[in-house]
Amino acid sequence: MSQYPLGVNSEVGKLRTVMVCQPGLAHERLTPDNCDELLFDDVLWVEQAQRDHQDFVEKMRARDIEVLEMHESLAETVKNPEALKWILDRKITPNLVGLPIMNELRSWFEGLDARQQADFLIGGVSVLDITPDKFSADVISLVRATQGDLGFVFPPLPNTQFTRDTTNWIYGGVTLNPMYWPARQQETLLAAAIYKFHPRFAGKVKVWWGDPDKDYGNATLEGGDVFPVGKGLVLVGMGERSSIQAITQLAQVLFAEKAAERIIVAAMPKTRSAMHLDTIFTFCDRDLINYFPKMVDQIKPYSIRPDESKPNGLDIREERKSFVDVVQEALGLKELRKVATGGNSYAADREQWDDANNVFALEPGVVVSYDRNLLTNKLLKAAGVEIVSIRSSELGRGRGGGRCMTCPIARDAAY
């Protein structure tokens, strides 16, 4: 399969290359006691989740889409000794794992094969992995005393399943996102390593903003809030996970690099059900959106444009029209067709919670959607959308659908 230029130029143009992350060891570490802390609503039947995820992957590959899997890409990355050292220098530190275990942990880790290293980097290293055949008795005793019998030396990252959020490609470059919740902050380090060292990406990636070595404080950004829709326009949700501190820094960089001309900020209610803009609003075609009116109608839109006469070079203005109307006008569309979440108020709330509005476009008018959202899918089909259905019973337990589970790396323009 030929390699396409890196860059995402729309929400619905033909998808060429995408990164996903199959459920694995990290999900086997989920328990009823820790799943809430790790941002999952329940534990998964991991084997079924893997089968369902592989079905999702095969359906994309059947449409000539190149699908990269994160465990595989990370394993290929850490075969480079420089890459492994770069990661371990940042993962196995006095502050993260503690001085007493550092040397033995690193020695053990460096002795693993590349796929095992990738599995543990994503899946975490648990107290149960600190065994007498690998570690001294004193280290084992100390780890159990400090972490308990089911604790972690470094924690699992089950939310890598949702590759959308950690990094996002905006036209010709990518952001390495400082995540909102501590449970997700280590994900960015692994994605950054892939882009920095993997043979596919090394020396070819333009980083717009973000650095896993820096503390960004309140400046948090997640890819579920970021939409590079085309025509120099970027939509960015500002709710639970992405902050104005990050959004305005991103705007400065994109304008300075001439990568964007306007940012439309969607100020949203800060709720778990609307954690990202893409949980309530997604594109299905060039002129068709799928949205949850109950939340989208509450969005307060702002526009950010470059203006050197303004403080920090940014002209920020509140829009007087609705978010959807502002997006329609910005794209120069005579009409932006809308499909609302299906059913009465009870059904719509249920389907939105189950990611009915988190569809993922493979090309104009073709989207991936969970099978359980029958009412919304029926309305999308009536609007002329082809539905590529995937099973949701296990994959959806982390609150994310097709858009959440994908990080497009190469996508055509749509306008």
UniProtKB/Swiss-Prot annotation:
Question: Which GO biological process categories is it annotated with?
Answer: arginine catabolic process to ornithine; arginine deiminase pathway
Note the Pfam families from the entry.
ADI
Q: Where in the cell is it found?
A: Cytoplasm
The entry's keywords: Arginine metabolism, Cytoplasm, Hydrolase
Its recorded reaction(s) are: L-arginine + H2O = L-citrulline + NH4(+)
**Where does this protein act, in terms of pathway?**
Amino-acid degradation; L-arginine degradation via ADI pathway; carbamoyl phosphate from L-arginine: step 1/2
Does Cytoplasm count among this protein's keywords?
A: yes
Protein family per UniProt: Belongs to the arginine deiminase family.
| Enzyme Commission identifier(s) | 3.5.3.6
InterPro entries from the xrefs?
A: Arg_deiminase (IPR003876)
Keyword ATP-binding set for record: no
Q: Which GO terms describe its molecular function?
A: arginine deiminase activity
- GO CC, any one term: cytoplasm
Cysteines engaged in disulfide bonds, as pairs: none
**Protein's name in the database:** Arginine deiminase
Q: Which residues form the active site?
A: C404 (amidino-cysteine intermediate)
